[in-house]
Amino acid sequence: MNNDAVFLSIKKICADYTVRLEKISPANFQLIPPIGGWSYSEVYQHIFDASILSLIPMEECIHGNAVKKHTVFAVKLILFFGMFPPAKRFKVPARLALRVKKIDHEEARMWISKFRLQLDADYPLISSADPHLRTLHPRLGYLNASEWLRVIEIHLKHHLKQLKRIEKSF
């Protein structure tokens, strides 16, 4: 998938998150769902916090503050298929898990907006990034700027599925 298609996909996914947000009552937004796990608010805070944090190493690749490493084959498969392996459960890295907190609708809108603004600023620079320069992802190894963009898309899609599961449980 090329960067333009990934970028447009991310914009559509963000729009979907925004539409879904407006349909969730403030009370349900804070509740732990019947299926357990994170509340809607925690999912929103996590996914957009993680997405914003993922822009930082992407920017490092863009600006040449990265190393020449290879992306491992298993990760290339994830990037190609656009999804995490179905049987594999990824545990949130401890440093991100500690950041998860409940937020309200307005804060969720702020997180979405902050991510979209930063992505819009960074995206045009990806094409000038050296594809051989990579920064370390805590679970996937070394990624270049385009691969970071793709991982952001995959992660956003993954948590969109989680929101759908939460919705069905109420």
Stretches found by the model and what they are:
Residues 3, 10-17, 21-49:
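Long, hydrophobic N-terminal alpha-helical segment
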Residues 31-80, 125, 130-170:
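Short, contiguous alpha-helical
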Residues 102, 106-113, 143-146, 150-153:
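Short, well-ordered coil↔helix boundary/capping segments
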Residues 19-28, 87-95, 128-134:
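Short alpha-helical hairpin
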Residues 8-11, 15, 45-52, 110-113, ...:
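Generic structural signal for well-ordered, non-transmembrane alpha-helical segments
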Residues 1-5, 56-112, 170:
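Short, helix-capping/interhelical loops that line the mouth of catalytic, cofactor-
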Residues 112-131:
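Active-site oxyanion/phosphate-handling segment shared across diverse enzymes
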